[in-house]
Amino acid sequence: MLTDQSKRDALLNTHIHPTAVIHPKAELHPTVTVGPYAVIGENVKIGAQTTIGAHAVIEGPIEIGIGNRIFPSAVIGLEPQDLKYKGAASWVKIGDYNTIREFVTINRATHADEVTEIGSHNLLMAYVHVAHNCVIEDHVIIANAVALAGHVHIESRAVIGGALGVHQFVRIGRNAMLGGMSRIDRDAPPYMAVEGNPSRVRALNLIGLKRAGLTAEDLSSLKKAFRLLYRSQLTFKEALEELQALSNNQYVEYLYQFLQASTTGEKRRGPIPGKN
């Protein structure tokens, strides 16, 4: 545990602009850089090699890992925009090597000991809003002006196009690709390309899957699953039952588990349908 004097000494050794306002109880690694007029509050912990841009605001409780780049005027860790919030000591937790661009807002969770969580190696472009209790896993790209409502969960390596909105409690599957300006009001299945208002599953996200290193055999299995779910004459329930028989492939198995949970899980909104 750092003493107050050691914290003050550490602050003197960091690269902090003289106009920045740092709470004396904030914990900044000596290699942290803080730009002009940034404000860092109490109960903030920031890891090594992280940079905080000019006019950024970071309030706690929050933990930020190593190597993050937080650009000017980002606002992170303020209380949620949720009428149920009653002043609880909720959290934001951010992993390592994220890029958080200008005017991004990331709100704390609503209830005590709950967390809004950002993983590692993510890119949040300018004006992205991450509401209370959201979870963003790893290697996610979110383009400009995307708004995530509360409790949205984005799995690893999803790509979210610009200027779209995501309804509360929606889950976006791994390696999914969401087209810009779409309305995402149901769960977006993993590995799929989704677009439109209302949004529909259009195709497999083949480019993203190839970049992720899936084999030709994996892609063939997912193509069969896609045709079964979105191009057959079966009802969705019937197609899901047939899909279970194909789930000897790990990616098809995950797709099946995701869709099953989407239709039966608590507070689930169901999966986005196909274009037909």
UniProtKB/Swiss-Prot annotation:
Involved in the biosynthesis of lipid A, a phosphorylated glycolipid that anchors the lipopolysaccharide to the outer membrane of the cell. The gene is lpxA. It is found in: Cytoplasm. GO terms for cellular component: carboxysome; cytoplasm; membrane. This is Acyl-[acyl-carrier-protein]--UDP-N-acetylglucosamine O-acyltransferase. It comes from Rippkaea orientalis (strain PCC 8801 / RF-1). Belongs to the transferase hexapeptide repeat family. LpxA subfamily. GO terms for molecular function: acyl-[acyl-carrier-protein]-UDP-N-acetylglucosamine O-acyltransferase activity; structural constituent of carboxysome shell. CDD domains: LbH_UDP-GlcNAc_AT. GO terms for biological process: lipid A biosynthetic process.
